[in-house]
């Protein structure tokens, strides 16, 4: 499989190219973990490219006008798709990576989607590895990539659950037999591996669990940064709760806001920092008004320096319906934060004693009681604990380098 490229330690005329397949390159969990890894790569040896998904449109006057004025951007590497610039676009391009575009998969466009994938891989023969993080359609694009001559195809499970309804059912359907369609199967946790690849694949040892590693040093607790961040937000003396995540069903924001409202009944100095963006943001802003907490909730959007906001927080909240292995929970622990987390989240994410698991079947008041009980504590440097638990991206990057160059995944 790896015979077409130079082995580790050999001279290479140019970098091998690894294609990561994702929904997009916004500030999401999988995207952020891949970017953490990308920054650690020697790009003279290994270069990352990205294949993302966007809505296919007819190029009428209005569409071309939006492209011309920069409010929407047609990627010249796309196929009839128009996409808005996303969070990581500039950094990827600055590091020498390319962003390619496929039409979003909608089930009804199954045949046109397959056609677009075939056309893409027929035109691009430069990839030595295709790593599919978008497992909902990996059963389609990985076999096509393999038949097109890509030496190695990888399916990487990044989540442990699907949304409700027909969309979730479709995801389950198209994931069937995925373990047999990839040369390597990776999962961010046992839970994610079981959900995506199935119990049999996990028990057979076919799936390798690779934790979502972070740049631990960037998040290490710093009292000076904490004071500066709180002063800038005007919350110097407040009890600061926080959450980082997309505004979407999975993250369970309605419940989170109800928990915060219950905290506010007991602590008049409490505030909530919400980092992230998404389609449900407007609805959550309205819910804040309904709960009477709008003036105490800070909708901060996507932030390049999210690590500063972790320093400002006192308690981190993650009441998700499901997760793979949430990188934000690892980041929060790296910042020395106490974390209140849904018991649906894998225990593999607990790298320190700072994590408390609670059921989202409990009343919001029960969560509020636990938050207030644990609110007074001394922050500490947890970097060594995170490193020893396998969450340091610098160490993980060495294993990935070996894998990309030789096919040996044992060191990841």
Give residue ranges: language-model regions.
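Nucleotide-activated donor-binding/catalytic signature segment of Leloir-type glycosyltransferases, i.e.
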Residues: 285-301
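A short helix/loop element that forms part of the nucleotide-sugar donor recognition site in Leloir-type
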Residues: 117, 220-235
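A short, active-site helix/loop in glycosyltransferases that binds the activated sugar's phosphate group
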Residues: 182-220
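A conserved mid-protein helix/loop that constitutes part of the nucleotide-sugar donor-binding site
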Residues: 31-36, 239, 243-262, 279-286
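N-terminal strand-loop element at the rim of the active site
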Residues: 14-112, 206, 279, 403
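Short His-centered aromatic/hydrophobic patch
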Residues: 132-138, 157
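Aromatic "clamp/platform" in nucleotide-sugar-dependent glycosyltransferases that forms part
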Residues: 302, 321
